[in-house]
């Protein structure tokens, strides 16, 4: 049997992993500017953590969950999204306690799992960056969080980003709109896709989210949820729009956007960018003021977003963005003969301990092959170390581009490599 990775997964090899690490580090730096701290939750949760929060009727729960019973007959699921596990952790660890500074700002970076048809930018194991902010109902929280995502895209150089905005209002507003949508869609039930016929009975707002052609046609003239917002919901949404304008963040109102998860209320948003003529969502989120209470905590407002790392990296590549990834090596040691083997290890280790990147030959190859490796590694400096150099206690180091060279003692190399490097590279 030929052993291969499971369908819908990927191996991220070192060349690509460097891009991942760069994007993750920019995200971490950005979030820390906004006073967010990292949280790490388990990759698997009790099934109810996801099903009850995300929604029993959502596609995630009905079609896409990786769930199983463990040896203790506990119903377990691999996490399909990040918000529910973070809310569970927030409640379980009593981060709502008065001594904890509010709002509580958390971010996560990690794997999520959904059993769906693998396609471009969509895998069964995928990686998500997400943020959650607990404890502030202030519309400024909505705008700050949206602005943070916008700031991240600016730092990464992503172009043509458009903010799509909508409000789902309060539970009362949503209930009134739900009925209006049922009244509108019921006469055209037979024209809907099979999935949306089911959604019409279980959660009619999800019909607006459908990607099926017949469903898109059916909802073209559907009533707008913004016409059903109560006074408080309307005031919240107006404040969000005003603050976005104050920060010069352009937006478009998208009344058919409802988000695929059941826990959202008030502000919801997506950032969309154009890639090769197609619109792609790169980030989505919104407000969820009832979720903490649903998990047994006190009623606590929340706001957050998630973005897929695979999709973000695909957009970076398609938009031709070059990430400033350091690929050069400081020095390569070409090693000739068994008598130089031990000293080469001593020297390369001493150089690394001074904060430099260094590599040496371990395979006993001819000098030409070793120099070729130095070029492949983009080594700035190259040193040839043979038995005669070991006996003399010194060797020649060359600038691999200019060919300028200098003879240095091993003692200098092991204690003051910075000066040697500066001398040859300046």
Swiss-Prot record:
- InterPro entries the UniProt entry points to: aa-tRNA-synth_II (IPR006195), aa-tRNA-synth_II/BPL/LPL (IPR045864), Anticodon-bd (IPR004154), Anticodon-bd_dom_sf (IPR036621), His-tRNA-ligase (IPR015807), HisRS-like_core (IPR041715), HisRS/HisZ (IPR004516), HisRS_anticodon (IPR033656)
PROSITE patterns in the record, alphabetically? Answer: AA_TRNA_LIGASE_II
Supply the EC number(s): 6.1.1.21
Which terms are listed as keywords in the entry? Aminoacyl-tRNA synthetase, ATP-binding, Cytoplasm, Ligase, Nucleotide-binding, Protein biosynthesis
The molecular function terms of the Gene Ontology recorded here are: ATP binding; catalytic activity, acting on a protein; histidine-tRNA ligase activity; transferase activity
Q: Which reaction does it catalyse?
A: tRNA(His) + L-histidine + ATP = L-histidyl-tRNA(His) + AMP + diphosphate + H(+)
Q: What is this protein called?
A: Histidine--tRNA ligase
Superkingdom is Bacteria
Signal peptide as annotated in the record: none
**HAMAP family noted in UniProt:** His_tRNA_synth
Q: Where is the protein found, in the record's own terms? A: Cytoplasm
What quaternary structure, including any partners, is listed in this protein's UniProt entry?
Homodimer.
> Which coarse location class applies to the principal site listed for this UniProt protein?
cytoplasm
One of the GO biological process terms: histidyl-tRNA aminoacylation
- Gene Ontology CC entries for this record: cytoplasm
Q: Which organism is it from?
A: Streptococcus pyogenes serotype M1
Report any Pfam family annotated for this entry: tRNA-synt_His
Q: Which SUPFAM superfamilies match?
A: Class II aaRS ABD-related, Class II aaRS and biotin synthetases
Which family is annotated?
A: Belongs to the class-II aminoacyl-tRNA synthetase family.
């Amino acid at each position: 049997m030929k052993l291969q990775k499971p369908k819908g997964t990927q191996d991220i090899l070192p060349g690509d992993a460097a891009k991942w690490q760069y994007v993750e580090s920019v995200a971490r730096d950005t979030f820390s500017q906004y006073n967010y701290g990292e949280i790490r939750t388990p990759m698997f949760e009790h099934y109810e953590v996801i099903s009850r929060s995300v929604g029993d009727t959502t596609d995630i729960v009905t079609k896409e969950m990786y769930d199983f019973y463990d040896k203790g007959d506990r119903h377990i699921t691999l996490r399909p999204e990040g918000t529910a596990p973070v809310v569970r952790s927030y409640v379980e660890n009593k981060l709502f306690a008065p001594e904890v500074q509010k709002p509580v700002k958390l971010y996560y970076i990690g794997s999520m799992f959904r059993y769906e048809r693998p396609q471009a930018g969509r895998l069964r194991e995928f990686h998500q960056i997400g943020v959650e902010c607990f404890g502030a109902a202030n519309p400024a929280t909505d705008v700050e969080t949206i602005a943070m995502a916008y700031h991240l895209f600016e730092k990464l150089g992503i172009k043509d980003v458009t903010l799509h905005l909508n409000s789902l209002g309060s539970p009362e507003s949503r209930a009134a709109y739900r009925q209006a949508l049922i009244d509108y869609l019921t006469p055209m039930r037979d024209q809907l896709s099979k999935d949306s016929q089911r959604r019409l009975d279980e959660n009619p707002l999800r019909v607006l989210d459908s990607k099926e052609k017949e469903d898109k046609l059916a909802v073209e003239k559907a009533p707008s949820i913004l016409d059903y917002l109560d006074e408080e919901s309307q005031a919240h949404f107006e404040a969000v729009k005003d603050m976005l304008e104050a920060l010069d963040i352009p937006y478009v109102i998208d009344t058919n956007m409802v988000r695929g998860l059941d826990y959202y209320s008030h502000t919801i948003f997506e950032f969309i960018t154009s890639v090769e003529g197609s619109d792609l969502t790169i980030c989505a989120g919104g407000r969820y003021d009832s979720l903490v209470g649903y998990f047994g905590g006190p009623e606590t407002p929340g706001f957050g977003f998630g973005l897929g790392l695979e999709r973000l990296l695909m957009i970076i590549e398609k938009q031709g963005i070059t990430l400033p990834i350091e690929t050069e090596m400081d020095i390569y040691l070409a090693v000739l003969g068994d008598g130089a083997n031990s000293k080469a290890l001593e020297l390369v280790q001493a150089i690394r301990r001074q904060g430099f990147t260094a590599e040496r030959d371990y395979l006993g190859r001819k000098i030409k092959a070793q120099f070729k490796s130095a070029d492949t590694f983009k080594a700035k400096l190259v040193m040839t170390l043979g038995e005669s150099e070991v006996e003399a206690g010194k060797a020649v180091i060359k600038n691999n581009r200019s060919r300028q060279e200098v003879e240095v003692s091993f003692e200098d190399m092991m204690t003051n490599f910075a000066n040697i490097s500066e001398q040859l590279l300046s």
